[in-house]
Swiss-Prot record:
HAMAP family: FBPase_class1. InterPro entries: FBPase_C_dom, FBPase_class-1, FBPase_N, FBPtase. One of its GO terms (biological process) is gluconeogenesis. GO terms for molecular function: fructose 1,6-bisphosphate 1-phosphatase activity; magnesium ion binding. The keyword Nucleotide-binding does not apply. The lineage of its organism: Bacteria, Pseudomonadati, Pseudomonadota, Gammaproteobacteria, Pseudomonadales. Pfam families: FBPase, FBPase_C. Its EC number is 3.1.3.11. PANTHER family: FRUCTOSE-1,6-BISPHOSPHATASE-RELATED, SEDOHEPTULOSE-1,7-BISPHOSPHATASE, CHLOROPLASTIC. Its cofactor is Mg(2+). This is Fructose-1,6-bisphosphatase class 1. Belongs to the FBPase class 1 family. Binds 2 magnesium ions per subunit.
Amino acid sequence: MSRVTLSRYLIEQTRSNNTPADLRFLIEVVARACKEISHHVSKGALGGVLGSMGTENVQGEVQKKLDVISNDILLEANEWGGHLAGMASEEMDNAYQIPGKYPKGAYLLVFDPLDGSSNIDVNVSVGTIFSVLRCPNQYLSQNESLNEAAFLQPGTEQVAAGYAIYGPQTMLILTLGNGVKGFTLDRELGSFVLTHENIRVPETTAEFAINMSNQRHWEAPVQRYVGELLAGETGPLKKNYNMRWIASMVADVHRILTRGGLFMYPRDAREPSKPGKLRLMYEANPMSFIIEQAGGASTNGYDRILDIKPESLHQRVSVILGSKEEVERVTAYHKE
């Protein structure tokens, strides 16, 4: 039986689910960009791409060389094809409008070009996260200037989302709103090949991912929930749990997507004015869309992540996502 490449899968989606041709093209362009990023990541010190740039992004985080390289790759790959009206990235202060010399398309692309880049120098899995939105009609005119407001749509408006994970294998995880598929990069063939047909998150779990060093700063509901996990068989949950923490959202969520579990990056008392650490638009929303499409759930503790109306491009949010039963439990604790 012949293998199904990403291109073939997307063509079949166009035939069976009326996936628009320009959306299909957009996903293929992003996938090609991810292949190029994977190449740079895999070269490491041999390619002179390790270390920092000595600059900070809009988040106040030190930019790694590969952050900037990955951002440039995604911009250059997507700006000319006529499928986008604009882009936004963790590494750019403002929205990026497609240059006037290129045709303008109907979609917006939002991305974290290299999630987990603090792990690059120690050779831990990193990845690219992306989200696709429709551009509001008022910005589709070739003469209309695009601004941040065009992107401020709740996660329920996403038409596609995915991530590439650069680890022992390079994989692309994708949802078009009808389930979650996994594609593995065949380097000999040069294509992403469908290897995971229908990814589902188990409803129950015995694993969780959280940075325990921040425990003293957490709010009471999270303190309670994690305390119950750690109590094991003798505690109220009557089950032993294992903790895993990679400090790369892509890597942690990928493990939960394939093995079940709960990923938590809750707000804490260190910066009470900030509702969380992770960014809503290009981290929490795409990952929540994927997790929900795989049968899981996602919340900020009180509300479904995908229902949150963004107020700014780089808005932060508390994130708790993964196996549905566990998400519902910790949400109930927040509401007591």
